[in-house]
Curated annotation (Swiss-Prot):
The lineage of its organism: Bacteria, Pseudomonadati, Pseudomonadota, Gammaproteobacteria, Enterobacterales. Transmembrane segments: none annotated. The keyword Membrane applies. InterPro entries: AzuC (IPR049862). It is found in: Cell inner membrane. It is a peripheral membrane protein. Induction: Constitutively expressed. Repressed in minimal glycerol medium, at low oxygen, induced by H(2)O(2), the thiol reductant diamide, at 45 degrees Celsius and at pH 5.5 (at protein level). Transcription is repressed by CRP. The keyword Cytoplasm does not apply. This is Uncharacterized protein AzuC.
């Protein structure tokens, strides 16, 4: 569960940094 928390925080940081880029592009 710790890993999930870290991934979620990284995902949130990504969203804050690149608000104009759809987050889906990072995982496809």
């Amino acid at each position: 569960m710790k890993l999930r928390k870290i991934l979620k925080s990284m995902f949130n940081n990504y969203c804050k940094t690149f608000k104009d880029v759809p987050p889906g592009n990072m995982f496809r």
